[in-house]
Amino acid sequence: MAEVRLGENETIESALRRFKKKIQKAGILPEVRRREHYEKPSQRRKRKLEASRRRRR
């Protein structure tokens, strides 16, 4: 879990920027979006196969 502690004389905006950067680096946001709805196992296999094809090109 990404955690950001507010430093002395640090604005909320800068702490929020650091938090967003940590979230993006950890890859949490895409994971949350992917898990938003149930994905059937066949759809998951199809998505992974397409991703591997794109990587091979």
From Swiss-Prot:
Residues 32-57 are annotated as: Disordered. This is Small ribosomal subunit protein bS21. Belongs to the bacterial ribosomal protein bS21 family. GO terms for biological process: translation. Residues 32-42 have a biased composition (Basic and acidic residues). One of its GO terms (cellular component) is ribonucleoprotein complex. GO terms for molecular function: structural constituent of ribosome. Residues 43-57 have a biased composition (Basic residues). Keywords: Ribonucleoprotein, Ribosomal protein. The keyword Magnesium does not apply. It comes from the Bacteria. InterPro entries: Ribosomal_bS21, Ribosomal_bS21_CS, Ribosomal_bS21_sf.
